[in-house]
A protein has these predicted regions:
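Histidine-centered catalytic micro-motifs
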Residues: 100-111, 163-167
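Acidic/His- and Gly-rich active-site-bordering loop/insert found
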Residues: 2-102, 111-114, 118-126
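Generic hydrophobic alpha-helical membrane-span motif
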Residues: 111-113, 171, 198
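Fold-level recognition of mixed alpha/beta catalytic cores in primary-metabolism enzymes, strongest
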Residues: 126-190
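Preference for bulky hydrophobic residues occupying beta-strand positions
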Residues: 63, 78, 132, 190-191
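Structural motif
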Residues: 55, 104, 133-135
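Single conserved hydrophobic/aromatic residue that forms the stacking wall/gate
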Residues: 188-198
Length: 198
């Protein structure tokens, strides 16, 4: 990883963040059943002084951090749910829930957003408002829709929202961005791919 740097305060939290991810990985929960995960997220956000709202979109969590008088606001979003599949790994933090597994990286996504929230809450090196959006039910059960219908952007208006998802195959230290909608689709109404609109 030549010429790459990690913010020292984030690097200092590496062990804690690894423990968070492993805990979430070992205790996966399906969409709209993320009770343990959302409670863990809310507890950590509160401990860092964020304003926390739970239950949006059933099990979603919003942490709000305001710094200074700037009225601009952004949303940073990560998903929390796991997939209905058995985990065959043998490491110590493998799934303890039969036939439920974090196979899509949402344990990492949740951890990364928690790490960002902790860093920004401690450093306060910006002006404005950040809404940390922890989304339930991303895996095909309509978690984003449920949050929006519960008033996500009415209660927590954002000038822009940045959603994040890991992408195997992308070089370490790189990230991709696009303007406009991303990572969105309609709920599947048919098993036929030709019936799914993107």
């Amino acid at each position: 990883m030549a010429n790459q740097t990690i913010i020292p305060e984030i690097e200092a939290n590496h062990e804690s963040m690894t423990a968070w991810r492993r805990d979430i990985h070992a205790n996966p929960e399906l969409g709209f059943e993320e009770y343990r995960t959302s409670a863990m997220v809310a507890e950590k956000l509160k401990s860092w002084g964020l304003e926390v709202h739970q239950g949006l979109g059933k099990t979603g969590v919003i942490g709000t951090l305001r710094v200074g008088n700037d009225t601009r606001s952004i949303g940073l979003r990560a998903d929390m749910d796991a997939l209905p599949m058995a985990e065959n790994n043998t490491f110590s933090h493998k799934s303890t829930n039969p036939n439920v597994m974090h196979a899509c990286g949402h344990d990492g996504h949740t951890t990364m957003l928690l790490g960002a929230a902790k860093y920004l809450a401690e450093s306060k090196n910006f002006e404005g408002c950040v809404h940390f959006i922890f989304q339930p039910g991303e895996e095909g059960v309509g978690g984003a829709k449920a949050m929006v219908e519960d008033g996500l952007f009415d209660q927590f208006p954002c000038d822009s929202v940045y959603g994040m998802h890991n992408r195997p195959g992308m070089a370490i230290g790189k990230f991709g961005m696009r303007s406009g909608a991303a990572m969105a689709c309609l709920l599947y109404t048919s098993p036929s791919p030709r019936d799914v609109e993107e």
